[in-house]
């Protein structure tokens, strides 16, 4: 994938649905974000530039390690990247678990473009304030 103008670092998208990854990538590139996409949590963990990721768009249900498990793994490693979860499942216990662990937002699929962009901007602002 060809990165566009780098406004803030990398926004990573982790979703096992290729159509969703492509749609989210197109939306974010049109908004001048540099993006990288991954089909699994394990693929994201192998990403050499993982420390450059400034926001993570993360599906809850993934093959292998799920999104909440990835969130825990990152936190345990001291990586405090803002996470915007997206899920087709409205399970409030999963939402509560993710939010208690520090997720920036928890959105339900289908995600409205404007809402997602607002949540990403808010997460990025919040992480800059905490830095």
Roles of regions detected by a PLM:
Residues 1-12, 18-25, 40, 114-131:
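Non-catalytic signal-transmission and effector/linker regions of two-component phosphorelay proteins
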Residues 59, 87:
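Active-site residues of response regulator receiver
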Residues 69, 90-105:
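Alpha4 helix (beta4-alpha4-beta5 surface) of REC/receiver domains from two-component response regulators
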Residues 109:
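A Lys-centered signature of the CheY-like receiver
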